A protein has these predicted regions:
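Beta-strand-turn-beta hairpins that frame and shape the catalytic cleft
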Residues: 1-4, 72-81, 121-127, 149-158
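N-terminal active-site segment of His-dependent metallophosphoesterases
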Residues: 1-51, 61, 66-69, 140-143, ...
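Binuclear metal-dependent phosphoesterase catalytic core
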Residues: 19, 76, 102-105, 128-165
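Short acidic, glycine/proline-enriched helix-loop-strand junctions
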Residues: 47-56, 120-134
Length: 165
């Protein structure tokens, strides 16, 4: 079993990152994904945790050219495809990113950009956008996600900021 913390669009609000990391300290997270906006936030996360933190750059990360635009991350018998998602039209985003990720062998597709939580299962592929813990655009008060992968199946927990304060 693998547990994957999924956060993005933190935009420099390190206090929200601290809140998330403190709240999940005893939840056996195996890795963290930060899909852009801001790259420095992902580097900060790495100083606060002993597990790998994978990051990609977003549309507000122009000053962070070292972060890749996309990553393919091994996950047991499959892969995670991660990108910020701002270069794909909103109405076609899920289908296009799933298509790209599947072509690379990924069954978990993660992106950000919209600041709105979304999960969708397309066949055996899971698409997750954990929203934004810092600047939500959906009235949620802020969200992040924890994805569990066990015996070839995914489970997603949407965690609301008000539940960890």
């Amino acid at each position: 079993m693998k547990r994957i913390g999924n956060i993005r669009d933190t935009h420099g609000y390190l206090d929200t990152i601290d809140l998330v990391l403190d709240a999940t300290m005893d939840q056996n997270i195996d890795m963290w994904l930060h899909a852009g906006d801001y790259g420095d936030d992902a580097r900060y996360m790495q100083t606060r945790t002993d597990v790998p933190v994978y990051a990609v750059r977003g549309n507000n990360d122009r000053v962070h050219p070292l972060e890749p635009k996309e990553q393919l991350i091994p996950l047991e018998d499959t892969y995670i495809y991660m990108t910020h998602g701002h270069e794909v039209s909103y109405d076609k985003r899920i289908q296009e990113l799933v298509h790209v990720g599947n072509a690379m062998g990924a069954r978990l597709i993660v992106c950000g950009h919209s600041h709105v939580y979304k999960k969708e299962l397309l066949g055996d592929t899971l698409f997750v956008n954990p929203g934004s813990i810092a600047l939500p655009r959906d009235g949620s008060g802020g969200t992040f996600a924890i994805v569990t992968y066990e015996d070839g199946a995914f489970d997603v927990e949407c965690v609301y900021k008000q539940d960890i304060i």
